[in-house]
């Protein structure tokens, strides 16, 4: 089905490209006009553009002139002039599309065009990159263009304080990673005052490497979580038990689906080891999760592939898509603790979700979204379906001359790597730079050992050397360089033949102590000479490497996604340079073993094929394509499923966050609180009068319940007497009496404390209760989703059931917010400001919760990111029926 959709989406490609080409021609026609201007006149165009916008013109009206201004500014500040194809890419981005541009076509420079144009509105532009280094590097380099034209630019980094973040978001153009933008959104919706909030809206986002961020990383939501009180001792116990269980005897493993199942023999063995009679008895239910995680940690999570153990005994996740270490991130649902127990390192506490959103729903909040990548067309259907984004392939500035050699397939991994080492040594001896792609830290280190034995000097780039990533990649195109890398080499930094002059120049400026923000004038004055020196140092080597055939890219294994293979290939042959690529495969590679086991078995049993001779077979090539198609289809379904369930929560989140923002922005809650009182009293009375008539109702019990809510000023006898006897007492009469009594008591409360104090108390109470109840609701929704799949066994649609029960839970939460807010407002002991000499500060509501260590789950490899700041979780969740909750609330409100 996606293939058919893809064909339909590509049908109008030619017309779109022609339209974009006409835009480039319009810009070219204006070029000489802006070339003739001096710097001051060119800078003044920004003011004139803004005046024209204020007068009613649109951004589309300004596009040709604005693009021409940016092109001229880039030529003067960076020494770079936008090519026509870059103008076309910029126009595609402005129109809210994904521009598919080959590696080396200058996507970073392309982003300056729509970023400048859309920043003229004053609403801000966000440029999203894949890591902090690229965000800082691009902001620093392209910021010179923006500053020249009178705009401000900034960068959001993980180490920044809230006040620095707020200042960065106030800039016209803000660079940062998807995680930083997403977590700031969640933190803003956990803030206790508008002064703590840092973002100013979501106007226009340009996502660099858009397929990596919106596709690869979209399977796992962003989650902020805080420590829970779950015990850690069981992880160690079950790690020992898992070591005593045998695969295919006590449990079974499905590597393809990454699932495990405990068999009957295993259950009996676990029960014997624990000394219990029935593992599935309700009291033992939590132990099942510990058991499953322990076996998963043993069988499905491999050291130096899925994670590494640092020298200080910390388990660090390795990003499955990029090969980078995810510093501080942690698997959720107890998985990380199970791995820590397996490795025998200190076990850290589990976490409770405080705020969450998927990347899909975060980016769909932007008024306009656009993206750039070298590999988007294979996912055009998903981009259109999920984000309503079109994919526009932009022509290359120069014809691509890279030669993609056919795959070489060997019977086993040993023979494959022997051939790989031989091929690398041959190209290295000739002086041709070689980039070798591997799929894991383990494989990169294995190949490094083989190359060392063969006497081939090389550099390894994997999760363990991530801090040197940019410098290694930037120099990977130098003569004779051999770089062994995991997927991380596929993103961000260009591999330029002879070396990256811009990278060298930026590094040299930093070495001189020059900063574009601290010393902008000195920076601008020194830049041309430093850049010229860097360019001269690499030019001669560039020509020499070009004559040797350019960069040779060698892949040691096919990835699960065709895009990642294409990204690796795309490192070579940039800007019309020569290049070559080839993949070496074996029949025992994970992709073949898991998805085409029968074919692998048939080839392995053939005795006539020598191990050191590659297999040439169209059947093998088709099998590889089929396997990648299966994985891509499966991952697409996972992402769609994540989004379907989050859409349910997203609607609830929008309601809660909107209410929360009203409170923060100072909306008068007086009328809302009055409605709360009526609603809660109505609920109490309705529950007490659900059966029978006036003579049957237990008014004493009702009044006792109401007294736990507010100081009731009437008695049951007075109400009955006013009605003319029990027989005349109706539900409507009782409701009218009790609502009036509650409202009168609140009037007295307001008169006692003063209107100003009560308004402040209302804001603090509602905010605190809303936050706590929302956290409890997230926990309940998580719990609901965990088991909802079992409804399919009863012929029920799990999603429909999740929507139905989620709606019920949300309704119960809103009622609980009303009930607790009313109870606190009546019961909290408040010292009036006149007596205290300061603003009223009710205990527990006078300030935000104590700040504590939080966990941040990022959208890759199902991990969590740890950041040492954040709002603490409020008091524990209330449990039980309404009567039990009332008792708990009374205890909480005692001062």
From Swiss-Prot:
Keywords: ATP-binding, Cell membrane, Cytoplasm, Membrane, Nucleotide-binding, Protein transport, Translocase, Translocation, Transport. SMART domains: SecA_DEAD, SecA_PP_bind. HAMAP family: SecA. The keyword Flavoprotein does not apply. It is found in: Cell membrane; Cytoplasm. Part of the Sec protein translocase complex. Interacts with the SecYEG preprotein conducting channel. Has a central role in coupling the hydrolysis of ATP to the transfer of proteins into and across the cell membrane, serving as an ATP-driven molecular motor driving the stepwise translocation of polypeptide chains across the membrane. Residues 838-849, 870-882 have a biased composition (Low complexity). It comes from the Bacteria. Its EC number is 7.4.2.8. This is Protein translocase subunit SecA. It is a peripheral membrane protein. GO terms for molecular function: ATP binding; protein-exporting ATPase activity. It is an enzyme of class 7 (translocase). ATP binds at residues 86, 104-108, 494. It catalyses: ATP + H2O + cellular proteinSide 1 = ADP + phosphate + cellular proteinSide 2. The gene is secA. GO terms for cellular component: cell envelope Sec protein transport complex; cytosol; plasma membrane. InterPro entries: Helicase_ATP-bd, Helicase_C-like, P-loop_NTPase, SecA, SecA_CS, SecA_DEAD, SecA_motor_DEAD, SecA_preprotein_X-link_dom. Pfam families: P-loop_SecA (PF21090), SecA_DEAD (PF07517), SecA_PP_bind (PF01043), SecA_SW (PF07516). Belongs to the SecA family. PANTHER family: CHLOROPLAST PROTEIN-TRANSPORTING ATPASE, SECA INNER MEMBRANE COMPONENT OF SEC PROTEIN SECRETION SYSTEM. GO terms for biological process: intracellular protein transmembrane transport; protein import; protein targeting; protein transport by the Sec complex. Residues 838-895 are annotated as: Disordered. Monomer and homodimer. Part of the essential Sec protein translocation apparatus which comprises SecA, SecYEG and auxiliary proteins SecDF. Other proteins may also be involved.
